[in-house]
Amino acid sequence: MTNERKEELQRQCSKFRNDLIDLLHSIQTGHPGGSLSCTEILTSLYFEIMHVNPENPEMEGRDHLILSKGHAAPMLYLVLAEKGFFPKEELKTLRQIDSMLQGHPCVHKTPGVELSTGPLGLGLSAGLGMAMADRIKGLDSYTYVVMGDGEIEEGCIWEAAMSASKFGADHLIGILDNNGVQLDGTLEEIM
């Protein structure tokens, strides 16, 4: 990656952060910390790494992203809107009853969302299933799972990690958002 491209992505991250604060302030609800801490992760994936097509979100052979830490959905929505999955005007409907943008990602409502998430710890298992299914189909796509550091205390995360190793799921990429904070305090205080 060139320095110019890196600076461009950094500017985009700054814009996403500002937009997130404005968005959550306007609706007076949301999880700003979890969304802010995954800004670089989601920006890098969607604007530099992943093979996706906003005009055809169900495209065969696309890469997949699972936001296992579903409470960070507002940042995902900002990124998806900027990428062109849906009009930016939809962001104003965040967390409204009939909105396509619920408090947690919903695969049935939001273009570009691959899995409905909310309960922590389930994303890596689902991602393993997606990666294995793509391998069986002969596809060269990748599945990226963004997890929070608090959720890796869940046993099912480690079962999925062991299974991924056993079955050689080399197209499954787990990404840990290590921000050091859980809902009730710091990681050191909770665990």
Regions found by a protein language model. Name each.
Residues 20-23, 35-166:
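Cofactor-binding active-site loop characterized by glycine-rich and histidine/acidic residues
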Residues 157-159, 188-191:
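Charged helix-capping and loop-helix junction motifs
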Residues 1-16:
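N-terminal hydrophobic or amphipathic helices/low-complexity stretches enriched
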Residues 166-190:
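A short, conserved beta-to-alpha structural element at the edge of catalytic cores
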Residues 13-29, 177-178:
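N-terminal capping segment at the start of a domain
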